[in-house]
């Protein structure tokens, strides 16, 4: 798990995301093209399809703070997802674990705190990109609603956790404020 994200460190998280944005966008596009031979349109179904060959274990675990992990047994990496959590959290966890399975070369070989924390930030940002894609246009087209209702609609439409939606919208707003292209414009 990466650092705990709160209002006080949100700008730092967005800054870290800016450092890894291009790399993560490239990885997201590679997944959508190279690992989606069956042209699955649902991001959630694609995640499950990618995890199955790794021996995905889905089981309810009575711990609201434990969403998933990768266990290594006899050299084989096996993803586990906590099904006791809401589906949105499960999908986010699935993409998070896919990042570790396919791209993370640090977390399984040795532990260096700063590298591991950055790999966790990359995994979370990657999961957010895979689930939320182009969130801002959807959000802005939800007219005549209060902020919280719009967030709930985004959570439902993208099957994404509350915190991921808030961070993505904040990041998009920061990008718009500084007139850089939105980090969420991937197809």
Annotate each PLM feature:
Residues 1-180, 184-187:
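Active-site hotspot residues in diverse enzymes, especially metal/ion-binding acidic/histidine motifs
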């Amino acid at each position: 798990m990466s650092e705990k994200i709160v209002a006080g460190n949100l700008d730092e998280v967005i800054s870290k995301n800016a450092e890894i944005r291009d790399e993560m966008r490239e990885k997201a596009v590679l997944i959508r093209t190279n690992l989606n031979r069956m042209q699955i349109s649902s991001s959630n179904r694609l995640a499950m399809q990618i995890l199955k060959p790794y021996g995905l274990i889905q089981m309810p675990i009575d711990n609201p703070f434990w969403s998933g992990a990768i266990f290594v047994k006899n050299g084989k990496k096996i993803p586990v997802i906590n099904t006791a959590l809401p589906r949105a959290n499960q999908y986010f966890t699935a993409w998070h674990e896919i990042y570790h399975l396919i791209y993370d070369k640090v977390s399984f070989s040795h532990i260096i705190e700063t590298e591991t924390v950055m790999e966790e930030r990359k995994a979370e940002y990657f999961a957010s990109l895979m689930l939320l894609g182009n969130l801002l246009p959807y959000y802005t087209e939800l007219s005549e609603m209060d902020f919280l209702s719009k967030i709930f609609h985004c959570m439902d439409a993208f099957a994404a956790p509350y915190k991921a939606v808030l961070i993505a919208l904040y990041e998009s707003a920061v990008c718009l404020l500084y007139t850089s292209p939105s980090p969420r414009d991937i197809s």
